[in-house]
């Protein structure tokens, strides 16, 4: 492996960040498949109602599961003040640009490996921009540059300008019948931009026999215009990280300020929802405020409990996910582990039924991935970019 790969451990880390990131990845790579398998095995209205928490909303609104991706972006931003401060103090700018470029390229390629069909080796089915890691690549690149080269006040101005710029574009630009305040799946400006810029390289797009590009009617995520607000999601984490790193405030007060700011942002986002709807698939500006507010409140809670009160009982296992988040994500999306438990446990299916057998397979895969990550954690091997 190249340098990018596995590196040994390192300076002191913010424990609450590792554990919160670990919780996020546990839900994504450890629990999601198990819960959806259970939804096919367990009958009853109460359990099916519970599954709303593990399902993305179709379009308008926000569910707990919709927070998983914004939290991932937010936490990448929290780390920026801890990892990039030396570049503000005169460290090599050449090294900074090399480091940011390397991180951007690797995250972009990892995203294509996970969701861009790069491993399919079929040029006609490669998707260019379609994955969470790529949104982090874009958001982190610009958030880090803003952090190094501008003041915190300027960064707030930039974040507001990006939010308002996205909103203004969606409201006032009309092209080919798209946009002009239209937030429907088939009529919004971000949809038109993705179709026009990505074309055949948009996720789920195919070229028909006549040579025309057809876009899947079920795929509604947008990426090009949404890159503006991806940057703000990462910047929101950077603001939280600057507060946490500051030595001018007592730790308990930092937690309180984070929580209050989170409440304000979420409240403003829901108020904005009346004019500029909260739509996660479009990454609207109101959704960024809502999700960033929730992220601030979660960060406040975890920071207070773990780093202020030093309570970690029953939580440290999450660091196995949190300190190898990219490895956990890629293992889950790039490798089909189901063949391993299926090869060993297929004899159970006639006895427990197909629905419960799917639960066994999902749980076995989750345990296998955790075991791999635990072995890496014990060996102090971490996938770095």
Give the positions of each predicted feature.
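Alpha-helical transmembrane segments and their immediate juxtamembrane cytosolic regions
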Residues: 1-385
């Amino acid at each position: 492996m190249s340098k990018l790969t596995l590196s040994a451990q390192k300076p002191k880390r913010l424990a609450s960040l590792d554990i919160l990131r670990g919780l996020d990845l546990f839900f994504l790579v450890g629990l999601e498949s198990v819960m959806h398998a259970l939804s096919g095995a367990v009958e009853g209205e109460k359990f099916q109602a519970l599954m709303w928490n593990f399902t993305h909303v179709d379009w308008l609104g926000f569910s707990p599961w919709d927070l998983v991706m914004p939290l991932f972006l937010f936490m990448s931003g929290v780390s920026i003040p801890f990892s990039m401060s030396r570049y503000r103090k005169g460290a090599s700018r050449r090294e900074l640009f090399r480091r940011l470029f390397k991180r951007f390229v690797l995250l972009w390629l990892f995203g294509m490996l996970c969701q861009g069909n790069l491993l399919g080796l079929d040029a006609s089915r490669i998707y260019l921009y379609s994955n969470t890691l790529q949104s982090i690549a874009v958001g982190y690149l610009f958030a880090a540059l803003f952090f190094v080269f501008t003041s915190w006040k300027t960064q707030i101005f930039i974040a507001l300008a990006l939010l308002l710029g996205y909103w203004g574009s969606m409201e006032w630009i009309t092209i080919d019948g798209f946009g002009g305040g239209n937030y429907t799946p088939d009529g919004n400006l971000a949809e038109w931009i993705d179709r026009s810029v990505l074309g055949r390289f948009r996720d789920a797009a195919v070229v028909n026999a006549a040579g025309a590009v057809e876009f899947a009617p079920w795929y509604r995520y947008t990426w090009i215009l949404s890159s503006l607000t991806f940057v703000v999601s990462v910047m929101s984490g950077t603001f939280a990280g600057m507060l946490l790193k500051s030595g001018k405030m007592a730790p308990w007060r930092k937690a309180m300020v984070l929580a209050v700011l989170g409440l304000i942002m979420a409240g403003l986002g829901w108020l904005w929802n009346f004019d500029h709807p909260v739509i996660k698939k479009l990454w609207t500006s109101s959704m960024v405020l809502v999700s960033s507010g929730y992220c601030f409140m979660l960060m406040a809670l975890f920071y207070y409990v773990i780093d202020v009160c030093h309570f970690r009982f029953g939580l440290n296992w999450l660091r196995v996910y949190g300190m190898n988040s990219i490895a956990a994500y890629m293992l889950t999306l790039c490798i089909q582990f189901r063949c391993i438990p299926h090869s060993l446990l297929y004899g159970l299916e006639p006895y427990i039924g197909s629905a419960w057998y799917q639960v066994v397979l999902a749980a076995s895969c989750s345990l296998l991935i955790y075991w791999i990550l635990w072995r890496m954690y014990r060996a102090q091997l971490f996938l770095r970019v």
